[in-house]
Amino acid sequence: MSLNIFWFLPTHGDGKYLGTSEGARAVDHGYLQQIAQAADRLGFGGVLIPTGRSCEDSWLVAASLIPVTQRLKFLVALRPGIISPTVAARQAATLDRLSNGRALFNLVTGGDPDELAGDGLHLNHQERYEASVEFTRIWRKVLEGENVDYDGKHIQVKGAKLLYPPIQQPRPSLYFGGSSEAAQDLAAEQVELYLTWGEPPAAVAEKIAQVREKAAAQGREVRFGIRLHVIVRETNEEAWAAAERLISHLDDDTISRAQASLARFDSVGQQRMAALHGGNRDNLEVSPNLWAGVGLVRGGAGTALVGDGPTVAARVKEYADLGIDTFIFSGYPHLEESYRVAELLFPHLDVQRPEQPKTGGYVSPFGEMVANDILPKSVSQS
């Protein structure tokens, strides 16, 4: 099975270490452009753009990077309760047209009650999912060209319609991640691709089976994806050393404050991430080559695959064997790590790469010439 591999745009900050300003770098438009263009050239299928008050706006970032990329797709956030479904449908169609069919959408219900209240959304967990189902039903139908009247508990529209359709027909794909039963019910009914954070394979298999069963009961099939960090090096020893360096500036106070902040979230997925490490930096390898160190201070995706290329590829294939075809990766710093993943991991996987334009570039693709006129030795790809 060919795998879709996406990268990540760190619109909330980037650096060499977690929990410190040492090694941090400015994430301005020029830097985001560097990462997007690297991902585009290296063969990543798309980039996930995060959402929330700690991030730049995902839609504006995506729109700004369309002209400087050629094949890269942009996975941007739909926020039920923050924007109306009909306006979101118009925006989605516009972004798809402007990008010539390179727009994808990630439904985000939110998990931080404090942030949601600041955005004017005062629904509890169950109510947010009720509203998200209503939002998605309307958004899908409008984007597919239907005239929509809808009288729901949370949302009511009359005569909603879209005058200018998207490039992708019947509409761009909808992604979504959530671990609660309400989230799985929504995924089974509404989305094309269900995402999970990087839990151990047995836990991921259980979630996939649950969503697959719920979707089948509605006569639907759902694809599956996973969100993970990657720390890949030429040797396993180098990779584990890099993992330790990433958290080498974390002290107990920083970890404690981060975990206390994340504890207020009502996201089941966030609770499952936190349970993997329990706020303790000992025994962070929670499954072979699956390391929970990132989650000590980072909300959301908190685990990384660690190892050399063949080792990480073997773990990726374990997830693929469960039915996962889409992997959304990231690494610190995101520019350098995009190259490491492409150069050290891609050769060991069947990666579904976007078609590359044929160019007559001046620089040869085989490396630097030896002694001015000798071609470097070629290396077989396994």
Swiss-Prot record:
<dbReference type="GO" id="GO:0008726">
    <property type="term" value="F:alkanesulfonate monooxygenase activity"/>
</dbReference>
<dbReference type="Pfam" id="PF00296">
    <property type="entry name" value="Bac_luciferase"/>
</dbReference>
<keyword id="KW-0288">FMN</keyword>
<keyword id="KW-0285">Flavoprotein</keyword>
<dbReference type="InterPro" id="IPR036661">
    <property type="entry name" value="Luciferase-like_sf"/>
</dbReference>
<protein>
    <recommendedName>
        <fullName>Alkanesulfonate monooxygenase</fullName>
        <ecNumber>1.14.14.5</ecNumber>
    </recommendedName>
</protein>
<dbReference type="InterPro" id="IPR050172">
    <property type="entry name" value="SsuD_RutA_monooxygenase"/>
</dbReference>
<dbReference type="InterPro" id="IPR019911">
    <property type="entry name" value="Alkanesulphonate_mOase_FMN-dep"/>
</dbReference>
<keyword id="KW-0560">Oxidoreductase</keyword>
<dbReference type="GO" id="GO:0046306">
    <property type="term" value="P:alkanesulfonate catabolic process"/>
</dbReference>
<comment type="similarity">
    <text>Belongs to the SsuD family.</text>
</comment>
<keyword id="KW-0503">Monooxygenase</keyword>
<dbReference type="InterPro" id="IPR011251">
    <property type="entry name" value="Luciferase-like_dom"/>
</dbReference>
<comment type="function">
    <text>Catalyzes the desulfonation of aliphatic sulfonates.</text>
</comment>
